Amino acid sequence: MPADIPKSVVQKLVFFTAAMIICPVATFFICQYLFSNNAIISGGVSALVANIVLIGYVVAAFMEDTTEQEPEETKKSR
C-alpha cells in the first residue's frame, strides 16, 4: 500500500538534496580559485555552506503545513 506523500514534500526533498551536493562542492572550487589554492579556507567555507543548506531544510520542514483535514462528522459516526 503506497503512502500518500504530498508532491510538495518530494519536490522540497529533491531540491535540498541537490543543493546539499552542489552548493558545497561549487563553493569549495570557487574558494580554491579566489584564495589561491588554500584548502583550509575552501573547506571551511564549504562546510559553512553545507550547514546553511541544512538549516534551510530544517526551517522549511518546520514551516510546512502538515495539518490534515478531518473528515466531517456524520450522524452515523457520532
Curated annotation (Swiss-Prot):
Keyword Endoplasmic reticulum in annotation: yes
Compartmental location: Endoplasmic reticulum membrane; Endoplasmic reticulum-Golgi intermediate compartment membrane; Cytoplasmic vesicle, COPII-coated vesicle membrane
Lumenal side: 36-38
Signal peptide: none
UniProt keyword annotations, A-Z: Cytoplasmic vesicle, Endoplasmic reticulum, Membrane, Transmembrane, Transmembrane helix
Gene Ontology annotations for the cellular component aspect, listed alphabetically: endoplasmic reticulum membrane; endoplasmic reticulum-Golgi intermediate compartment membrane; ER to Golgi transport vesicle membrane
Membrane topology category: Multi-pass membrane protein
Chief location of this protein within or outside the cell: endoplasmic reticulum
Segments on the Cytoplasmic side according to the record's topology features: 1-14, 60-78
Parts of the chain that traverse the membrane: 15-35, 39-59
Biological process according to GO: vacuolar proton-transporting V-type ATPase complex assembly
One Pfam family this sequence matches: VMA21
Annotated motif Prevents secretion from ER, positions: 75-78
Keyword Disulfide bond: no
InterPro entries: Vma21
Free-text function comment from the UniProt entry: Required for the assembly of the V0 complex of the vacuolar ATPase (V-ATPase) in the endoplasmic reticulum.
Family (UniProt): Belongs to the VMA21 family.
Protein name: Vacuolar ATPase assembly integral membrane protein VMA21
Lineage, broadest ranks: Eukaryota, Fungi, Dikarya, Ascomycota, Saccharomycotina
